[in-house]
Amino acid sequence: MKIALAQINPTVGDFAGNTRKILEFASRAEKLGVDLVAFPELAVCGYPPADLLEKDAFVAHAGRSVDEIARWTADAGRPAILCGTVMPAASSNGKKVRNVAVLLSGGKVCFEQQKTL
């Protein structure tokens, strides 16, 4: 298995730019026969998002970007992508969002792992 580690510098709130960086790096990795490309924490939305996490539109935009990246993985032979993002929280602890790593392959989210301290 070939794994590529992508050291990109995402910009907070630049979903289009961050998605483009992710897909450009993944495309280069595909040409090298890579099976999995791993991106940094919060690569989709940028780090640190600070109070932007309180805005529902910010979290929704992150979800749309994840969907776009997942669709890219649908074509046969493309590498899986592991990247960090934010997602709505379904918890009773009062938090609206969660910091997660998502594994994207075959055009969908295959697995997600929430960050815990």
Per-range role (PLM):
Residues M1-D14, V100, E112-K115:
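Active-site-proximal beta-strand elements of phosphoester/diester hydrolases
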Residues N9-L23, A60:
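N-terminal phosphate-binding loop and adjacent alpha-helix
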Residues N18, A29-L52, L82:
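Active-site beta-strand/loop signature of hydrolases that rely on acidic residues for catalysis
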Residues A57-L117:
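Catalytic-core segment of enzymes that process non-peptidic bonds
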Residues K2, E30-G33, G77, V97:
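Short loop/turn motifs at secondary-structure junctions
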Residues A26-A29, T73:
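Hydrophobic pocket-lining residues that define ligand/cofactor binding sites across diverse proteins
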Residues V12-G13, C45-Y47, A89-S91:
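Flexible loop/turn segments at secondary-structure boundaries
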Residues A6, F39-P40, G84, L104:
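Generic beta-strand/beta-sheet core signal
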